[in-house]
């Protein structure tokens, strides 16, 4: 089973809201997931405290046991939007 950390889309039409989830790679984007790690709201400005909110300790755990972050989640980590050095 290949596990990925990815975004699952929620919200209404033209008002996207994403959850950062851990899911099996074979499951559909908005399908069943193992654990919800946080959320991402692209409708808010980047400076807003609720733009991205993630349980950093759980994110570090899943990365340590071999879960792969998708391109977008890896971009958040690389740019420092999700700061994994805080814990």
UniProtKB/Swiss-Prot annotation:
Gene3D superfamilies: 3.30.1320.10
GO CC entries: cytoplasm; small ribosomal subunit
Top-level taxon: Bacteria
Record organism: Ehrlichia canis (strain Jake)
Disulfide bond entries: none
HAMAP family associated with the record: Ribosomal_bS16
Entry's family note: Belongs to the bacterial ribosomal protein bS16 family.
Keywords: Ribonucleoprotein, Ribosomal protein
Name of the protein this chain belongs to: Small ribosomal subunit protein bS16
GO molecular function: structural constituent of ribosome
One family name in Pfam for this protein: Ribosomal_S16
Record-linked InterPro entries: Ribosomal_bS16, Ribosomal_bS16_CS, Ribosomal_bS16_dom_sf
PROSITE patterns assigned to the protein according to its UniProt record, in alphabetical order: RIBOSOMAL_S16
């Amino acid at each position: 089973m290949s596990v990925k950390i990815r975004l699952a889309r929620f919200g209404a039409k033209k008002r996207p809201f994403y959850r950062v989830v851990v899911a099996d790679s074979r499951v559909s984007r908005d399908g069943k997931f193992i654990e919800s790690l946080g959320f991402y709201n692209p409708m808010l400005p980047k400076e807003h405290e609720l733009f991205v909110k993630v349980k950093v300790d759980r994110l570090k755990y899943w990365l340590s046991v071999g879960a792969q972050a998708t391109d977008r989640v890896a971009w958040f980590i690389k740019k420092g939007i999700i700061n994994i050095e805080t814990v």
